[in-house]
């Protein structure tokens, strides 16, 4: 299953206010949050309970960058995602969806 979502980073996104004044860059945690919400919407399943297996941030994300978020589920059940902006790969990662029953309580 391959799914693609597009999102353009709004120039007035609140995270730009304090994340490098004079050189606004979208924080990685915001980028990851956008990817997780995009994947959750596409698969119709909450990702509140998931394990982030790996994430690599490869290139900065700037205001008005048009992003493409693509994900696919591997045979292992892991979901692989890539975020690109034109020819630039912005981020890549893998997540595992866990059931609430398999999540240990603390």
Q: For each of these PLM feature ranges, what is it?
A:
Residues 1, 42, 46, 53, ...:
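A generic hydrophobic-segment detector
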Residues 1-26:
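Catalytic strand-loop segment that frames the active site of acyl-thioester-processing enzymes
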Residues 19, 23, 29, 58-60, ...:
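Surface-exposed loop/turn and secondary-structure junction residues enriched for glycine/proline
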Residues 50, 54-87:
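Hydrophobic beta-sheet segments that form the core/acyl-binding groove
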């Amino acid at each position: 299953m391959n799914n693609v979502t597009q999102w353009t980073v709004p120039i007035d996104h609140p995270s730009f206010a304090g994340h490098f004044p004079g050189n606004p860059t979208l924080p990685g945690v915001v980028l990851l949050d956008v990817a997780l919400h995009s994947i959750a919407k596409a698969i119709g399943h909450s990702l509140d309970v998931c394990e982030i297996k790996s994430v690599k941030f490869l290139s900065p994300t700037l205001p008005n960058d048009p992003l493409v978020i693509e994900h696919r589920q591997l045979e292992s059940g892991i979901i692989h995602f890539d975020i690109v902006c034109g020819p630039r790969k912005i981020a890549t990662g893998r997540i595992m969806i866990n059931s609430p029953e398999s999540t240990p309580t603390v």
